[in-house]
Regions:
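Structural preference for beta-rich elements and adjacent junctions enriched in aromatics
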Residues: 1-187
């Protein structure tokens, strides 16, 4: 129930040291089904007000980490980045997408209909790409730290910024993605 200081410094934070990391990411490209080429540690925590995610993106060549456009909601696909979708209703249809790069760029979007989108032109709006609405901007925080190990990021998402069913015992879905540009890798 404690608050986490959002500063990107994960290894020195006592709260994160008590959370077992998720480490098994699988490549989508270039080697579908193979383990991710660089170690990645993801941790999740929450309290009554925030949903927290931390990631340590280890990199054997941190000098090769690439960063692209720094504008909010600019695409993160062609740079070193980390993204996740929270499926608060666990329906595998809708969710909230958050991401960043090693410079701390904010990326967020609302996912509808598995991201497939609405085919009716009268319902499409600017900023909607398929079923991904990048015009949706929540209030949340992210901080990053770079080092000889690679980079790390901490996210704090206010629960009031996302929709979910009330109740104490709810199951949410979550999906993570790490992009490693030097390997043209998505995991």
């Amino acid at each position: 129930n404690s608050n986490i200081t959002i500063d990107g410094k994960i290894s020195s934070d006592k709260v994160w040291s008590n959370v077992k990391p998720i480490t098994s990411l699988t490549q989508i490209t270039p080697n579908f089904g193979s383990p991710i080429s660089e170690d990645t540690q993801i941790r999740i925590a929450y309290n009554d007000f925030y949903f927290y995610v931390s990631v340590i993106c280890f990199d054997s060549s941190p000098e090769k980490i690439q960063v692209g456009d720094s504008r909010r909601d600019a695409a993160l696909n062609d740079e070193d980045s980390f993204l996740f979708i929270i499926d608060t209703f666990n329906d595998q249809q809708n969710g909230f997408l958050f991401g960043t790069n090693s410079d701390g760029k904010e990326f967020d979007a609302q996912i509808n209909n598995e991201g497939v989108g609405n085919r009716s032109s009268n319902r499409q709006q600017g900023g909607v790409i398929g079923g991904t609405n990048i015009n949706w901007d929540a209030s949340w925080d992210v901080a990053v730290e770079k080092g000889s190990y690679g980079w790390s990021a901490e996210f704090a998402i206010p629960l009031r910024s996302i929709r979910f069913s009330p109740g104490k015992t709810k199951t949410w879905g979550i999906n993570f993605q790490r992009n490693i540009s030097k390997n043209t890798e998505i995991a």
